[in-house]
Amino acid sequence: LKAINAIRMGGVDVLPLVEGGKGVAVSTGASCGEWAGAGGIGTFSGVNADSYDADGNVIRQVYHGRTRRDRHEELVAYGIAGGLAQAREARDRAGPTGRVHMNVLWEMGGAERILRGVLEGAKGLINGITCGAGMPYKLAEISREFNVFYYPIVSSGRAFTALWKRSYSKVSELLGGVVYEDPWLAGGHNGLSNSEDPNKPEAPYERVLKLRQQMRQFGLGDVPIIMAGGVWWLEEWQDWIDNPELGPIAFQFGTRPLVTQESPISEVWKQRLLTLKPGDVLLQPFSPTGFYSSAVRNEFLSDLEHRNERQVAISPEPVGEHTAEYGVGPRKRLVWLAPGDLTRVHNWEAAGYTEALRTPDNTLVFVTPQNSREILKDQTDCMGCLSHCRFSNWTQHGPDYTNGKKADPRSFCIQKTLQDIAHDGPIEHNLMFAGHNAYRFGQDPFYSNGFVPSVRQLVERIMTGR
């Protein structure tokens, strides 16, 4: 293995190993501080982060507001308190010189307010902000206000060029690095564009090279690119290390830090990760954000897949092939279906899927009465955790705080499920984000006999090339 040398990033020399930030409440100050203390760049998530009571117990985020706007205000307050708690713990563990980054999603509810609130209250504790999920144009000016480095997450050179031309060129001195996130391999939400096929992955080398060529045109040849998604053993990336064509490269690990002693996820979740097989992680379109995302196949995803399959197109009047009448809801309001679809509907109803829910796309999906009640309750309980949500039709922009469409029952409340799984909820019935290489836990001798390393042991291991 080539020697893995420190690189210059954010004004200092660090190991080219970056911890990937995972919200809700999975990348904590504990994990971040230990990673930074080991010489890499630690990252805690500022997405609905946990705060703690005087005894160190997690304060569960309970909402009391009458409207979703009121609850959104509570969410922002929880977000700032949680971000501060994680920043303090990260800095305590990292020591004065460890590099601590906060990860936020630009499309999370109240992103800008939470980011400013945490940076305001945590002066001197945070060295950098990593931000993806959308086009975070304002990241540069916020970084300048608080004098921290910024690290946009992009999945193409084109996205970076747009950010650079619109705002980053004005604050180039604080651009610490650019994260290239492989949209086919990374865990969690992915930046697949409309021109890319979820089923046709493209190898990262050419895409990262294009990004570097764009960056060189802007005079950014020495700004590191951080490769995220699909990184496991560094010996597999030897042709990327010290490669003059690519320039300085660091590597981001998001999935591997899930299985560490400091990782806050449940033992059941850790053990499940250690037994995954190739193909157990699914790139799927059900997220209320509108982005594709990658998660472990389980009953939760299977329910969403089947719900989306139990779907028929409807018309408000008989037209074309829509000639079969069907009554929707308690008042049996008439819509028209294709006769073949009516047969399918009768079969679903016979199997217990008796509730027809309308979608924004002039279709009906069929669910059980219990499922229907749960969907409705989750939509009603919305606390505005995204800038806009297709599941509940919330948007954080006034005057009426709705996206103007019907709430979409083909999706789910992401805040509810991520909070639940992060705090010992059942792993079969929640969204379990992971990268596509997670099956390698089961093949990597490092984890044999169910071994769970500390974060520092993991960093040492990665430095051996494996």
Task: Show where each model-derived region lies.
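Active-site entrance/lid segments in N-terminal catalytic domains of soluble metabolic enzymes
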Residues: 1-220, 400-405, 410-466
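Conserved active-site-proximal phosphate/metal-binding subdomains
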Residues: 18, 185-204, 214-222, 234-466
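Short glycine/serine/threonine-rich phosphate/pyrophosphate-binding segments
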Residues: 27-30, 233-237
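A short glycine-centered flexible hinge/capping loop motif at secondary-structure junctions
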Residues: 226-233
